[in-house]
Each structure stands twice: as C-alpha cells, then as structure tokens.
Amino acid sequence: CIRDRRLGTQIKSRRLKLLGIWLFHVLGKRYIGIFLDPVLACNFRCKMCYFSDEQKRKSLRGTLKYEEIEAIAGSLFHRALKLQVGCGAEPTLHKDLVKIIALGKRYNVPYVSLTTNGNLLTKELLAAAVKNGLDELTLSAHGFTRETYEYLMTNGKFDLFCKLLANVTEIKKQYPQFKLRINYTINNNNIEELSRIWEVVGDELDILQLRPIQKIGESEYRDFDLTNIHARYDAVLVPLIEECRRRHITCLAPNKQNIIVLEENEAEDNSIEKITYCLSLIHI
C-alpha cells in the first residue's frame, strides 16, 4: 500500500490519475482506502487533540453495531486496497474489534491496519487481531519519556505503552510480517525526545511517521509555532531520518523547506484523494 500511494504521487497528471481510477473501477479492481472509526470516543484526552475540548467531545458519540459494519463491508470492502481501523477516535473501545479486522480479511483486503494509543491493547487482544489478519499496528506517541508522554497524552500510562512494545516484539516472533508503525506529532515540548526513540521502541519498528503539529480543531495545547522545529531540523530530524535508513526503516517525514507549510493547503487540489479514500464515522 505504501508503494501504491507513492506511485500515485509520482504521477503528476490529474487526467491520467482519473483515467487510471476509472479503469480500475470498470475492471472491478481495488483502488480505495477505507478509514473506519467504529466508535467515536477515546480513553485519552491528548492535549493536541480535539478530544481535549469538552465542547467537541459532546458532539462525538456513537458506536457502529457490527451488523452496520458488515453492511459497510458489503458495499465497499471489495474495492479496498487498505482498511484502516481507527483514524479520529480510539477503536480499541469497540467490543468487536477483532471481528472487524477479520471482516477485512474475509473480503480479502490486502492491507489491514489498526491506529490506536494502545493503552487498552492487551497482549491477548493484539495476538488475536494479528491472527485474524492485522497487518500493521500504528501507535500514537507524543513523547519518549514518562513525563512528556503522560503530560501530552492525558490519561495515558507510559508503562502500558512500553509493555505493548514488548508484546509486539513477542508477537513478531510468530508473525514476522506483522508491522509496527509509530506516529509522532512533533511540537516544541517533545522534539528533543526523538533522540531517545531507539532506547524506548527497540528494534521492531518498521515505519516511523513524523508530523509537525497542526491545529485540528480546538485543543488544550496552544503552541503551534513551528519556528523552532524548523531551526532544529538538521540537528534532530536529519540524524533520525538517516538512522532509519541505516536500519531499513521507512521514515515518513516532511522536507525541511516544507516544515512550516500546512498540508491542508486550501489551494491544493485534493480531488483525487476524495474519490479514492473513504472515511466512515458515525454520529448519533
């Protein structure tokens, strides 16, 4: 899926992209990514997230029944290149998490991932998810010390994060193709802790995604200034990117010249993404 996305970015012609999508559609091929939030709730109140805003939380409620997810699967999963469970909330709060992952594999979705803070993910639950077809675990992390992790990820426990990483190591022995991704949102409080990643994460990391902080609604955290992150790029991010390359780890990071350019630029044409990525949430 990473290769497929990169191929899409290498093709610059919008018309050629649309032609390719049309051909995939008429030939019955897979061409969409599905991002599914089975429950609109979270056990964390991360300071950079809209779940730290009490008013926003009041509008985020509801759970998809498994039968409703089956209906979504029947309509869309046969077209999916990727199913990502969890994108704007915490999917491990759903009681049928493993069944949802298994449903993706029942429809032969090539790549099924789970995005989570991980604190509710026991070794038994993770093992069951991988056994039933989970290809990738994406863990959100906003710090690599207990102090910063628990400060930025309110309600989170650093010990549970570290325990989960140890469980991933054990599960990978049985399922070596299973992948671990870390999503790290960089701000002025945690940029220097990136140098500690290896002593915390160990040797099992497959993908590291680094994203400068952006405002995604109202949140408790208010420091969106990227000036220092830009200034520290060569000292902090470049060595990390090079170390990832040495370890054969995929590192997804912005270029220095783009560090202060918002990805959600209103002038950018995102029509291709709109027709190839399907977002499913529920409000009750």
Where would I find each of the regions flagged by the language model?
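Short boundary motifs at domain starts and secondary-structure transition points
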Residues: C1, W22-L27, E266-A267
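Conserved small/polar residues in nucleotide/adenosyl-binding loops
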Residues: C1-R5, I282-I284
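Conserved alpha-helical substructure of the radical SAM core
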Residues: R6-E136, E147, Y151, K163, ...
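Radical SAM enzyme [4Fe-4S]-AdoMet core and its adjacent flexible, acidic
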Residues: D37, S52, K58-S59, L64, ...
